[in-house]
Amino acid sequence: GVELKRLEPSEPGRIEPEEVFALVDSRTRMAALASCHYVSGYRIEIDTIGRELRSRGILFCVDGIQTIGAFPTPVEHVDFLAADAHKWMLGPCASGVLYVKHEMQARLKPVVQGWHNLNCPDFIARETLDYKPDSRRYEAGTANLLGIVGHRASLQLLNALGLDNIATDLLAKRRRLVPGLLAKGCDVMHADVPEANASGIVTFH
């Protein structure tokens, strides 16, 4: 069977690399983390965590929905990354992205077969299943074409604006917002977080 371990960070919504490393061991097969916490706005150190996990032979899966489209999200040391389009990518619901490291694709067996992900000349029945050699192997049937069109338009907009420009603008707004909230007596979650871990999400009361 599979044993699931839940990471309980010392501070809510703030996961430090050392806490991840302390939880995994020689039996750990995969670690799954969000690139940014949806309440605290804390961005994890993806490269630091991913590099160490890889050195230990542990797969790294990232939920990137809170950073893709808002901040650069490195995947050099990530095996899988998924993100829906409807948040920071500004795209429609039911559209999204899935990144699978090239070296991992041969290890993953598609669970659904269809006319898109199989090599099947002339649609003649075959004795064996021969999957497409690239990411098409995971796209079995007709795609969400309208969603893809909308998603493509949103990506064109983001590329035109520039991801670094978007990230810089979000952090500039945060630098103005957080002191203003503190001055009014608000309690701001992780107000003192380094900008390398900050995002466009600010929670306060």
Residue ranges: model-predicted function:
Residues 1-205:
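Pyridoxal 5′-phosphate
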